[in-house]
Design a protein with these regions (language model features):
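Conserved N-terminal beta1-alpha1 strand-loop-helix module at the mouth
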Residues: 1-70
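Hydrophobic faces of well-ordered beta-strands that scaffold small-molecule active sites
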Residues: 24-31, 51-55, 82-86, 113-115, ...
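Active-site-proximal loop/turn and secondary-structure-junction residues that shape catalytic pockets
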Residues: 32-34, 57-61, 86-90, 117-121, ...
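Short, acidic/polar
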Residues: 33-46, 93-104, 156-165
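Generic structural signal for hydrophobic
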Residues: 42-46, 75, 104-108, 134, ...
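Glycine-rich phosphate-binding active-site loops on the catalytic face of alpha/beta enzymes
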Residues: 57, 108, 112-119, 167-183, ...
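Active-site-adjacent beta->alpha loops and helix N-cap segments on the catalytic face
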Residues: 61-74, 91-100, 118-139, 152-155, ...
């Protein structure tokens, strides 16, 4: 990876950010149908900031197979995990083609699958078998907890219990459902505001395994809250591809929503004096970023 454009000036603020291949601080993007050229442009600009690439719901069913294979090959070469949206697997389940689905996903070049029951009922034994089936076909299983219908939403503890069970059965990560709207689903109310009590319940029940959750958070206020709660290396999903750099700036404290707290903390601790005359200094002498570390380094929610 080449040096970033402003490293010589603000390189210190990036200290603490996990680097690829990341086990935490994942960014999962949703792709509704990017072509090869657009995908290449995105990877040139922000490829090292993307960890998971989801071809959302059933969109990949309409892409020419050779184009999809080339696209997935390019993404995999960059170390990005690729998978079709869970709704496509749910359709295959309804039509009795789930094993064929796994075989075909692997043949096309996907490296993972999303296993969900957002639309259909899925008994626990079938959920467990799907996780095993994915592994048997060389695919990394990523499950999703939650329902897409705003009128039928499971409680926070139910989401956490299912996530823990999925991880025990072999899921590598568990995504918390929010859809692409981020409203009226899961941990968000009808206006897209975070239900803080729900996040607290899930976090408490998950314990250290909360780091295996990918919180779908398509809206800026949701991303801000989760970064403030869990630190810059929280796993976030359903990020529009055009918002990857904006999210990274939010993680690093390079946007108002997170930088304001960093500036206040530096002033409070005497590391920055608004009245002081600036002296010539090297990037290494600049104060670090006290507000955007892992929650394990500073305590969840402490900035």
């Amino acid at each position: 990876m080449s040096e970033r454009a402003w490293t010589q000036v603000i390189g210190r603020v990036l200290v603490g950010r996990e680097q690829p291949p990341r086990k935490s601080g994942l960014t999962m993007v949703i792709d509704k149908g990017h072509g090869l050229a657009m995908t290449a442009d995105l990877l040139e600009m922000s490829g090292d900031l993307i960890d998971h690439w989801k071809c959302t719901f059933g969109t990949s069913a309409f892409v020419p197979a050779d184009v999809l294979r080339r696209k997935l090959l390019h993404l995999t070469a960059r170390g990005i995990l690729t998978y079709p949206g869970g709704t496509l697997l749910e359709v295959a389940i309804v039509y009795g083609n789930c094993r064929t689905f796994m075989q075909h996903a692997h043949m096309l070049g996907f490296s993972a699958v999303e296993i969900s029951d957002g639309t259909i009922p899925l008994p626990l034994h079938r959920r467990r078998n799907l996780i095993r089936c994915a592994i048997d076909h060389g695919l990394r299983p990523i499950t999703e907890v939650g329902k897409k219908d705003p009128q039928h939403q499971p409680g926070a503890l139910e989401l956490a219990e299912q996530a823990l069970q999925d991880l025990e059965w072999g899921a590598q990560w568990v995504t918390v459902e929010a859809r692409e709207s981020g409203k009226g689903i899961g941990i968000y109310d009808d206006h897209g505001m975070v239900k803080t009590e729900a996040v607290a319940e899930i976090s408490e029940r998950m314990g250290p395994l909360v780091n295996r959750l990918i919180w779908e958070a398509p809206l800026k206020n949701q991303q801000t809250y989760l970064i403030q709660q869990f630190g810059m290396n929280v796993n976030l999903g359903n990020i529009p591809t055009g918002e990857v750099l904006a999210l990274e700036a939010l993680r690093a404290g390079l946007r108002f929503e997170t930088f304001s707290r960093v500036a206040e903390e530096l002033e409070r601790t005497g590391q920055w004096n608004p009245d002081a005359v600036e002296e010539v200094s090297s990037p290494e002498s600049l104060p670090g970023n006290p507000g955007l570390l892992h929650s394990s380094e500073q305590g969840a929610g402490q900035w």
